[in-house]
Structures are given as C-alpha cells and as structure tokens.
C-alpha cells in the first residue's frame, strides 16, 4: 500500500481549540485526522467529541491510538505509536495487547500492514514520510548538534538568537522552494486536492513559517519540532496530553465521550436531527472544498449550533 493514510499526526495544534473554544462540558464536532486534537482534549476535559474523517484508514489510525492508551501505559503508547525511539520488538509485543481492543476490520487491516506497526504508525503516513525525509536532509545540512542545542534551550528568546546565528541560511530558502513545489509536494507529500486554492509560491509560504516553527514556542515543549527534526520526542513533557502520565486517569475516565466515524463533516452536519453541537473544529477543510460548498456548510452549522 503506497499511502495507507495521509497524516500520522494531526497538523492542528489542540491548544488552539482549547484556548479558542468554551469546551468544558460541551459537544464538539471535529475532523479526526491523526487524532491528536480529540484525544488531547478528551484527556484534559470532560466533554463529548465526535471526530469524523472521509478516510477510513485515518479513522483506523485513530482507533488504534485509542486502543493503545486503553491497554498500555503512557510511555508504552508513545513507543508503540512511534513518538519514542524505534523499538520493533516492543511494538510487536504491545500490539498483541492493543489488538484486543480493535474492531475486526481494523485488526485485519493492521495485520495486513504489520510493517506500519513495527516501524511506528505516526511516521509512515504520506505527509510524515515526505516531511521526515526533508528534515533528515535539513539536519544533515545544518548538523544534528545544532538541532540538539536548540531543542535544549531554556527560553524562546535564546531560540531566536540561536536560530538567527546558526540556522538561518540562504540555501534553506532554496530547499523549501524545491521540496514544497506543487509538482513535488502535491504528489508525494499531500493529496493534490488540498492545493486547489494555492496562490503564489508554496515554498516561500512555508519558509516564512520556518522561523516561527523553531522560535515561537519553547523547544522542550514542542513535540512537532522534536519529532520531525530528530525522529522522536526527546522530552516527555512535550508529548501530547493523551500520552502523558498526568492525564492518563482523566483520559480513561473521559474517553467514553469520544467517538470516531468514517464520514465527512458535511454529511454529518447535513443529517443532524436532535443532536446539536456547541463547538466545531473544522481544521483546514476549506483548502479541500470549493467556495460554494464551504459557504453552504458554514450556513448549515450556524443554523444547527446549540447556543
């Protein structure tokens, strides 16, 4: 299977939803993607979440993560999923426990694609494989020592200074233009449908976000930075809440309020009856939809939102 699923990790930061939405005790409809947003929110808050995705394999990935946190300790789940350093023997052993939590069709899928399990499921999506390849080139170019020094910085101010002195180089901009050219990125890194509204240089846009990626949040708390540049999360404090020991008890208590469904948000909203939501997290679905379709969805959401 060339691309079993597009995203191993949600590209949306759950902190955005947590800060922007009045979520405690509410009902949220969101895009499932890699599962980090709904799983992290349910680990910290008592609420109801319905997470939907047009891809059945994204849903299978999310249910695998649910099975992992229900049957393993947090540090074991992190290793099993691929956040921690590679350990194929441990992952195979852990999968024997996780398998008992999976629906029959999901179990058959993962057994057919067992190499995804042994290699770590989060790093074997279309997007992650592409970006991790690019990041390995980047780290080889600037030196792993510099990345480790930055990851160990104690403040964002130090990260700013270090980035401008040691990492900001003209060749990096050229690399971004190549790696994120629509012809290459739209085939290997992302489904081309997600670029239908793209205007201007995608590589330049990514480059402008590049410095923020390194300097806008404390590196020790940024699991995206650590995972993409080093291939694993270095500091446990950076792991998503659903993989942290501090939230494990509340996660197990609240997870009954979380469901995953293979369905589009458009279809879910269209067929709402008595069930209404207090909050919606739509991710970047507008990138994949025509304007008229998105306008129709937003109009329907406004009419059917519980206030």
Language-model features: where?
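A short glycine-rich, Lys/Arg-flanked "PGG" loop and its adjoining helix->strand segment in the class I
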Residues: 293-307
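Conserved acidic E/D residue at the C-terminus of a beta-strand in Rossmann-like folds
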Residues: 51-56
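Conserved beta-strand positions in the Rossmann-like core of class I SAM-dependent methyltransferases
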Residues: 29, 50
């Amino acid at each position: 299977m060339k691309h079993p699923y597009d995203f191993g990790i949600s590209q949306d930061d759950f902190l955005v939803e947590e800060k922007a939405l009045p979520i405690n005790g509410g009902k949220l409809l969101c895009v499932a993607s890699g599962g980090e947003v709904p799983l992290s929110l349910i680990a910290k808050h008592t609420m109801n979440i319905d997470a939907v995705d047009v891809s059945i394999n994204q849903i299978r990935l999310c249910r695998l993560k649910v099975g992992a946190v229900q049957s393993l300790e947090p540090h074991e789940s992190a290793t099993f999923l691929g956040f921690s350093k590679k350990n194929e023997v441990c992952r195979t052993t852990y999968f024997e426990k996780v398998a008992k939590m999976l629906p029959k069709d999901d179990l058959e899928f993962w057994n057919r694609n067992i190499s995804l399990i042994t290699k770590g499921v989060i790093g074997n999506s279309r997007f992650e494989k592409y970006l991790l390849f690019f990041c390995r080139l980047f780290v080889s170019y600037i030196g792993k020592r510099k990345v480790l020094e930055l990851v160990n910085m104690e403040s964002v101010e130090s990260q700013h200074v270090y980035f401008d002195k040691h990492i900001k180089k003209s060749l990096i901009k050229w690399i971004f233009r190549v790696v994120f050219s629509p012809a290459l990125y739209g085939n290997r890194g992302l489904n081309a449908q997600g670029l239908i509204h793209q205007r201007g240089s995608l590589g330049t846009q990514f480059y402008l976000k590049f410095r923020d990626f390194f300097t806008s949040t404390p590196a020790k708390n940024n699991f995206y930075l650590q995972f993409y540049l080093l291939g694993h999360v270095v500091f446990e404090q950076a792991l998503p809440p659903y993989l942290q020991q501090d939230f494990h008890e509340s996660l197990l208590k609240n997870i009954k309020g979380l469901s995953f469904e293979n369905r589009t948000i458009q279809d879910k909203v269209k067929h709402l009856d008595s069930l209404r939501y207090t909050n919606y997290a739509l991710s970047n679905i507008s990138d994949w939809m025509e304007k008229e379709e998105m306008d129709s969805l937003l109009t329907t959401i406004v009419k059917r939102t519980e206030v």
